[in-house]
From Swiss-Prot:
This is Protein-L-isoaspartate O-methyltransferase. It is an enzyme of class 2 (transferase). It is found in: Cytoplasm. It catalyses: [protein]-L-isoaspartate + S-adenosyl-L-methionine = [protein]-L-isoaspartate alpha-methyl ester + S-adenosyl-L-homocysteine. Signal peptide: none annotated. The gene is pcm. InterPro entries: PCMT, SAM-dependent_MTases_sf. NCBIfam families: pimt, PRK00312.1. Pfam families: PCMT. GO terms for cellular component: cytoplasm. The keyword Nucleotide-binding does not apply. GO terms for biological process: methylation; protein modification process; protein repair.
Amino acid sequence: MVSSVAPPPEKMMFQLSLRRRGISDRAVLQAMEAVPRDRFVDPVHRDGAWRDTALPIACGQTISQPFVVAYMTEQLRLEAGHRLLEIGTGSGYHAAVLSRLVRDVVSVERFKTLADRARARLKELNYANVEVLLGDGFAIPEGAGTFDRIIVTAAMTELSQPLLDLLDPGGILIAPIGPANGRQTLIRVERKDDDFIRKALVDVRFVPALTGIAREL
């Protein structure tokens, strides 16, 4: 895996910003520091790659604010042996962070352009335990199996039972829930046998999750 080579002052400020905002998990901080965010943003935005802000990418999507990436990752309580499903690959940045903390990442992206670019970028940077699939995040194939952890990186209006059923007992799902132009809340769901225990975490703002596959974009 390629590690970040950001100039020391930028990297130090990046880490300090995350710590000041409450990120304390050492493994998460190390993963955030190691992944070269500047390699996942468009060239025109690379000067701002290490700032704590979301940035636009292709297909009207965004690469999430680093604090949000770190916070969601921390809330997943990841372990090295976990198998994780990500819905919404985007640039591939969050998948790269997650890949340093778990055994396998399966990431589903509905936009062909984003899926192809993320797959190529992750391969170039040697993130070998990430599989990027072109697909509909609302219709994960049964053959995908089940997962220890699930993360959704676009806002859904609700969580479907088929998605919850992909979570192994003892597993955790993190997702932003709410309308595209209204209040959204980051939700953590823990599966206890056949019960799904929900907890509201923080208010957030994400692009909306869309159904279908955009093969022409």
